[in-house]
Regions:
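Non-globular, low-confidence helical/coil segments that flank catalytic cores
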Residues: 1-173
């Protein structure tokens, strides 16, 4: 199982692959779409079970092909969707000015924030997949990021990928 951040540091996509299946969390942009397609090919993903489009006000359509799509823009404000896919359980919460996605893989949880997400209580996860969006709604222990962002403490080494082993081990790159 692999989780990779790809594309632009301003709008990184998340590609989750397990064997030949994948889930993609997409934030838009042609260059990011191309990076996603390259990463899917690199990881040998033949089936994209889900593309979750995290944009609440997209300027262009998401053209990534998938068995299912979950566009945040089509969700009512303050609603959630939960989908079980081969690589992960995907939970998307749409707020007024953004969305939060929590991925559950085995006993590990990962969060992605797009836009501004305000919650009464923070969501607690092991890993935050970072973007320019300040993750005030998320309490996390570890970070995956393409680069350091203004809201971050000065982190010296950042990994953009994580490989999860079947029996609990992991490796960041």
């Amino acid at each position: 199982m692999h989780i990779d951040l790809v594309g632009s540091a301003n709008a990184p996509a998340v590609v989750v692959t397990q064997n030949d299946t994948a889930v993609v969390l997409f934030r838009g942009g042609n260059s990011v779409r191309n990076a996603v397609e390259e990463q899917l090919a690199r990881r040998g993903a033949q089936t994209v079970e889900l593309v979750a489009d995290l944009r609440t006000n997209p300027k262009t359509a998401c053209t990534l092909e998938a068995e299912r799509t979950l566009p945040a823009a089509e969700m009512a404000v303050n609603t959630a969707q939960k989908l079980r896919c081969t690589p992960a359980l995907v939970e998307m919460l749409r707020t007024r000015n953004g969305c939060l996605v929590r991925l559950t893989v085995g006993n590990r949880q990962f969060a992605v924030v797009n836009g501004t997400v305000e919650l009464a209580k923070q969501v607690t996860v092991q890993w935050l997949m970072a973007s320019p969006a300040k993750p005030d709604a998320v309490q996390y222990k570890n970070v995956l990021a393409l680069r350091s962002y203004d809201w971050m403490d000065n982190r010296k080494e950042l990994a953009a990928s994580i490989s999860l082993r079947r029996h609990g081990g992991l490796k960041t790159e």
